[in-house]
Structures are given as C-alpha cells and as structure tokens.
C-alpha cells in the first residue's frame, strides 16, 4: 500500500485477528455478524473521527488503517481535531488532507497544558472540549452520515476490521 502520490509506502494496516480469537461457541454468530456488517457498511456513509496530539509516530499506520476501513464503506470521511502538537503531527495531517479531500482536519494552538494520562477530571474536561469540536464539525458538514466511529489515533496495534464489521 502506498500514499496517493504512489511513492511512499504506508505501514501494513493488517490487524492480527488471529491473536484475538473469538470464543469457539460464539464463532458462528460472530461470522454472521461480520458478514451482515460488511453488507451494511458497503451501503453506508461513515465518518471516522478522533483527537490527535503528538501522534506522529503512529499516524502513518492510523492513516493506512482508516483508508482500509473506509474502503469497506460506500463513502467515508475522516475528521481529526489536532491541538498543541510539538512533533510532526500537524504536518502529517496537513499532507493527508492535501492528498485526500475526504479528510477534514481542525488543527489549532490552544495552549492547553499537558496532563498526565489517567482519569483526572481536568484531563477528561480537556478531552471532552476537544471531542466537542469534532462533533460540531460533523453536525455542520456531515450530518447525512449513517454512522460515526470514534478512533484512537495513537494505537500501535490498530483495530480489528472484523470487529468493526461485527
């Protein structure tokens, strides 16, 4: 898989489905749900959305995964809210936006402090405020979408495509 320009290889977006097997007694039902989900998604418009801050190391793989997931849909959009990154995240997102008109990036310097990971109230309020930015954008521009799927943009292992379909 390469970038739309064709010269930069993107990471393999494959998810190690075999490392997370379905319980044997649920296998038949799971396969049925995946099959039905594949048909439903193929007829649907989906908005994938998420937050990004200093996620440059994971962003090429996230991009590849979202493009692969988007290919399962009749149509899709990606809405990413980025703020206060100190790495190459804004540049990578701007390049993705230039390469693909389905990608919508809100990038801004808010001066928000870095808060430690965890469940602290201040961090949750900060994340909620940023989340509301992409919800507003979706309401303004993509309210005809059939589904909205929130993604973590910094997951090293990605997400299960079969799980998405189920």
Predicted regions and their residues:
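Short beta-strand/loop segment that forms part of the nucleotide-sugar
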Residues: 75-84, 107-108
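N-proximal low-complexity "stem/linker" segments adjacent to membrane-targeting elements
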Residues: 2-68
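Short, surface-exposed basic-aromatic patches at helix termini and helix-loop junctions that form
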Residues: 68-71, 94-99, 165-166
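Active-site-proximal specificity loops/subdomain of glycosyltransferases
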Residues: 88-145
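Short beta-strand-to-loop acidic/aromatic patch adjacent to the donor-nucleotide binding site
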Residues: 142-156
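Short beta-strand/turn micro-motifs composed of small residues
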Residues: 52, 82, 152
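Conserved donor-nucleotide/metal-binding helix-loop-beta segment in metal-dependent transferases, i.e.
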Residues: 155-166
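Preference for well-ordered, secondary-structure-rich cores of eukaryotic proteins
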Residues: 45, 61-63, 67-70, 77-79, ...
């Amino acid at each position: 898989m390469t970038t739309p320009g064709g010269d930069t290889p993107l990471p393999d977006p494959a998810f190690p489905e075999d490392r997370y097997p379905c319980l044997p007694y649920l296998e038949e039902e799971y396969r049925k749900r995946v099959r039905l989900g594949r048909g439903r998604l193929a007829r649907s418009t989906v908005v994938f959305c998420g937050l990004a801050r200093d996620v440059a190391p994971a962003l090429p793989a996230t991009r590849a995964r979202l493009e692969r997931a988007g290919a399962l849909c009749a149509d899709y959009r990606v809405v990413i809210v980025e703020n206060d990154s100190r790495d190459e995240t804004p540049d990578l997102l701007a390049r993705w936006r230039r390469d693909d008109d389905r990608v919508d990036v809100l990038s801004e310097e808010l001066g928000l402090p870095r808060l430690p990971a965890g469940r602290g109230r201040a961090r949750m309020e900060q994340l909620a405020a940023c989340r509301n930015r992409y919800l507003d954008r979706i309401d303004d521009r993509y309210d005809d979408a059939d589904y909205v799927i929130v993604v973590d943009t910094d997951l090293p292992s990605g997400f299960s495509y079969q799980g998405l379909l189920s």
